[in-house]
């Protein structure tokens, strides 16, 4: 559906599997899409700022979907991985277990040249985001853990 509205927001695209796709379990092959996802299109001359990314985060929450695709020719703001809009996208993923992927001019050019397809592109970006926020490799056992474990047995 295009440009549908909630009571407070407009949704550019609400994408869901067709009945045939659901009956053939196509969504199992692409689990990162869930049953549906939102798509936000921003045609700005500059990267999308943190305010609009924050509004998109809010829209994902109130729509109860776990994937959002933001299409922005110039991407989103942030000099480093954890700065501005890029940082908000990662923090949102960590806290809410919901993912926003950004498709920029490079991605759109790849799609138009048929160097990739939309399923692979979005899937790779979701996977990259998940790996980027995974902190488990940095967790090491603390020497006092065994003491806590023993005191819990009493």
Where are these regions (language model features)?
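Mixed-charge (Asp/Glu-Lys/Arg
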Residues: 1-154
């Amino acid at each position: 559906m295009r440009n549908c509205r909630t009571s407070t927001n407009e949704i550019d695209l609400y994408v869901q599997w067709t009945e045939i796709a659901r009956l053939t379990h196509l969504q199992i092959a692409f689990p990162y899409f869930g049953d549906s996802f939102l798509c936000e299109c921003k045609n700005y001359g500059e990267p999308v700022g943190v305010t609009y990314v924050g509004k998109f985060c809010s829209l994902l929450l109130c729509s109860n979907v776990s994937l959002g695709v933001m299409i922005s020719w110039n991407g989103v703001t942030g000099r480093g991985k954890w700065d501005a809009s890029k940082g908000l996208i990662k923090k949102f993923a960590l806290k809410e277990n919901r993912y926003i992927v950004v498709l920029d001019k490079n991605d759109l050019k790849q799609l138009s040249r048929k160097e990739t397809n939309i399923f692979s592109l979005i899937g790779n970006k979701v996977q990259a985001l998940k790996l980027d926020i995974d902190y488990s490799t940095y967790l090491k056992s603390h020497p006092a853990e065994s003491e806590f474990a023993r005191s819990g047995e009493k």
